[in-house]
Amino acid sequence: MIRVIQRVVVIVCMVLQAQTALAEGLQEIAVALAYPRKEVIAKIAERKGGDVVSALILERALIRKRADRAQGSPCEQVEDSLKSGCLLLVSANAISDGRFDDLRGIFATLDTRAKNQLFQLVPVALFEKLAALSPTRLISQAETNIALSTESEGFLQDSTKPVVDIEINGQKVSGALDTGASVTLISEQDARQLELTPLHYDAEIGTYYRAGKVKAALYQIKELKIGNTQMRDVVVLVGGQMTLIGLDMISRFDSLYLSPERIAINLSAHELASLEKECRARVFLNSDFMRFNQFLYFIAKVDGKSTIVALDSGYSGDYLATAIMPQGAVRDITSSGVVNDARGAAYEQPYSAEVEVEAGNKTIRMPAIFSGTRKLPAPYVLGWRGFSHYHLVYNVKSARACLI
């Protein structure tokens, strides 16, 4: 069987700095955002106002919902060594939620040091551009159920795809609901037929499965509808050859259920509670400060060794991708070796081996694919085919997620 891998994971490369270039307090927070270990969180929480910062980190990581939702800046009582980091987290949340009007108020509270640290992570031009925009508004939100089929345009496929209908400014396009995409991306082809407002800011996107960069640009959509969720004044990137609904947009739903048979958005309270009772393994969010790079992951044992496995519904080609050549791997002769992503088609030489994945007392044997041309976000990535064994339940509103 010829198998074509079609995949892009979005990373926005907007002058991001290495963690080692950050001030000490920011380094601690950056480490905790990547992998929130108890000892790191505890060290932050011990300091003045550290409980506020740790609560922001834990909520971002999908570990615990913040209890304190008082009006005003949550960072007012935070000590100086953590204050800049706290304000950066709040700024990032505002950008991710589309609360661009809040950015102006946050910026007014920054001292010179905090501004300098902010602009290490976000270019001044981008911050000013976003702060001047109208905030994204949620117009309506209701439950949506999408049954997925292996039939496409009269032909049978060997698996379903997480494709949903999207309405942009009244015109319909299709896009992948992609848990492996940091941000939402509209393809150049789709953008040409839509009435989008250019924001005159250029960026770059990169791919995990073909290491490289593609030029993109910032646009604002007047009206966006995904299922029964309707929003106005939504900021997206335009570039490349694939339209993807990324984690920034997914995080604006109340909840999400994702399996090869069905996609459900904004589930009823009863169904969501019922699904959460079946949870086998916790799912967390890894992110940088500004959420320009972020991915969902779970902890599993692969061939008996504990490791991180990212969740990527947009990676449709395989069950499991690996950044490490598996023991006993052989050339994968079932693959065409063709990879399609935002930069077009390319050829790779994949190798495969059967591995044992154990998560939440559920053990599955599945093929793991290795290719030297890929730059993965984690040691292993569960692709769309792997979702047949592990379904995602994402309770966005309560800041928790799991696999069933």
Language-model regions, residue ranges each:
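Bacterial N-terminal signal peptides
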Residues: V8-Q17
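Bacterial N-terminal signal peptides that target proteins for export
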Residues: M1-V9
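Pepsin/retropepsin-fold aspartyl endopeptidases
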Residues: L22-I404
